[in-house]
């Protein structure tokens, strides 16, 4: 995949080169999307819209730390949707990991989460955040045990995962309604990079074959069910819906 690769002063150019090889990235100075290695972390920037700022993964501080400490905990919608209750913590495969937010919430509550991400730039950002999280004295010990990343397309990888998880979680990109200059900066940068997941309908069947207890699909409230298959149950929030499917 082509992206503009930049190394800020103080960062290690050798590390950027290794990163490019690992994720099979080629540098294109004309590309609108830039992957920037700073002394602190790896960032994604949209070069023609610098005001959007940088996207990066940070499990240690910022919004994710705040959500872990002060969020709804087991009362969070995603926790209820995957079936967390009492002492039960399902083993989860997050087949559309993105920046790992929902996976982190589940891991912080005690679930083991195996994340799949097929886009190499997104996988590189997620891996960078994970590696920094693994080194943190507070969250590192449980993060290493509970959150792992596999760079692969779920369309093919879901057939090979072993052992089978109790829950498969899907949150495919869905086109936003036009009104959204309101759409968060992150989604704008993301959609420039990966577009919408036009082949996401193909994930439902292999996910249902893999999960032993349930498949959970996160959808915007205005979106039709994935693959137009009616869910067996659903839970709703202000702007989203968690569709729940039984295994097949």
From Swiss-Prot:
One of its GO terms (cellular component) is cytoplasm. S-adenosyl-L-methionine binds at residues 101-102, 117-118, 153-154, 171. GO terms for molecular function: rRNA (guanine-N2-)-methyltransferase activity. Coiled coil: none annotated. It catalyses: guanosine(1516) in 16S rRNA + S-adenosyl-L-methionine = N(2)-methylguanosine(1516) in 16S rRNA + S-adenosyl-L-homocysteine + H(+). The keyword Methyltransferase applies. Pfam families: SAM_MT. It is found in: Cytoplasm. Keywords: Cytoplasm, Methyltransferase, rRNA processing, S-adenosyl-L-methionine, Transferase. Its EC number is 2.1.1.242. It comes from the Bacteria. The keyword Acyltransferase does not apply. InterPro entries: 16SrRNA_methylTrfase_J, SAM-dependent_MTases_sf. Belongs to the methyltransferase superfamily. RsmJ family. Specifically methylates the guanosine in position 1516 of 16S rRNA. HAMAP family: 16SrRNA_methyltr_J. PANTHER family: RIBOSOMAL RNA SMALL SUBUNIT METHYLTRANSFERASE J. This is Ribosomal RNA small subunit methyltransferase J. It comes from Serratia proteamaculans (strain 568). The gene is rsmJ.
